[in-house]
Amino acid sequence: MENFKHLPEPFRIRVIEPVKRTTREYREKAILNAGMNPFLLDSEDVFIDLLTDSGTGAITQEMQAAMFRGDEAYSGSRSYHALARAVKDIFGYEYTIPTHQGRGAEQIYIPVLIKKREKEKGLDRSKMVALSNYFFDTTQGHTQINCCVAKNVYTEEAFDTGVKADFKGNFDLEKLEQAILEAGPANVPYIVSTITCNSAGGQPVSIANLKAVYEIAQRYDIPVIMDSARFAENAYFIQQRERDYRNWSIEEITREAYKYADGLAMSAKKDAMVQMGGLLCFKDESFFDVYTECRTLCVVQEGFPTYGGLEGGAMERLAVGLYDGMRQDWLAYRINQVEYLVNGLEAIGVICQQAGGHAAFVDAGKLLPHIPADQFPAHALACELYKVAGIRAVEIGSLLLGRDPATGKQHPCPAELLRLTIPRATYTQTHMDFIIEAFEKVKANARNVKGLEFTYEPPVLRHFTARLKEKA
């Protein structure tokens, strides 16, 4: 089947959810009532939902069947042990704590690592800096509410939509070491390797880069946590683009990559394909003290550490989903679907970030050059796209990045992107064609799209619940 121009979806659709069609007038009223924030729309008013791929896709029949094996014991559940075995087999990590989702893991490990650094290295809490190739929004939020600065050290080409590169998600290694020295190694409680790098456009990180980051971290005795939401997509890109690993399986690449971290935090709602679930895992006995403290904190914040806020059936489903998300044919289809959408958008003159793993990222700054960054061009584009076609997408730009907690000033954003996030096994090529046609209509009226200003601005993670209005 290799000689066909386009292969169809490698699955059969057995259950469907009807969606309603709405009028332009209806959608204009809906987005206005939502405070010009697509997050606040009701899902029944959305025709194609590209807000996120987090827990919004279909699951496999094997995952559904696994739920019936659930052991709902409060402690010592056999479903927990099934999940822990899967983690050890796939990642090589000894210690597993389930959580309700990724941010559940973050709210546990971040304060524990800060406390450990303070106790062992004399960390100065007034000078704390955590580093990443690019923090996911909730990771940044949890870092900041623990009074730690979140600093991103990405490469120069990462946000340049005019540049093609194999691994645009990589750390800038020189900037990483410079940032460590500027803060003082004792004041860096952790480094987060985000794979794939969501905010840069779902761009992958090479094993060579992960290894180099880990070597730098070990030099200064700084723990590395792998933000693992899209670990399988990252492994697929490594297989396709990093010469040394072209003949390796996804499973082999994954095991190799996770040698270069001390722990992992995962929103399992992405590559593990579940609707709800997360993981916090540590590699070996060198982090047993951290694991022990995290288990204690888990009881307070998530639940007993052998269920972590998940029912037994959900842990069984997650154990299967970790494997199902690594299937070669599945990953090839998923990455090709994103590439098809990006190519279609660029064919009509809509500039995008290089095709990445889970979404097409439209360069809203170039599509709406008349809207300045402080009026959130990508968010304005999201509102216009909804008005035109009922498509919900999400801004990855100045609105998401937020303000400097110390000064209150808007953080400078390297790019104003609109993320069209594709849920797993949910939308077909016909949907992609509809999205492309919708952008043709948006592009024709682009000069009339207005910037936005706040009517309500939350202090943290403002993009989720902010309310805005169009500038006069």
UniProtKB/Swiss-Prot annotation:
Family recorded in the similarity comment = Belongs to the beta-eliminating lyase family.
Q: What residue range is the signal peptide?
A: none
Q: What is its EC number?
A: 4.1.99.1
Annotated SUPFAM superfamilies: PLP-dependent transferases
Keywords of the record, alphabetical order, are: Lyase, Pyridoxal phosphate, Tryptophan catabolism
Which gene does this sequence derive from? tnaA
Instruction: Quote one Gene Ontology molecular function term.
Output: tryptophanase activity
Q: Which residues cross the membrane?
A: none
Q: In which pathway does it act?
A: Amino-acid degradation; L-tryptophan degradation via pyruvate pathway; indole and pyruvate from L-tryptophan: step 1/1
Q: What is the lineage of its organism?
A: Bacteria, Pseudomonadati, Pseudomonadota, Gammaproteobacteria, Vibrionales
Q: What is an example of a Pfam family matching this protein? A: Beta_elim_lyase
Q: What is the name attached to this protein's record? A: Tryptophanase
Provide the cofactor list for this protein.
pyridoxal 5'-phosphate
Q: Which domain of life is it from?
A: Bacteria
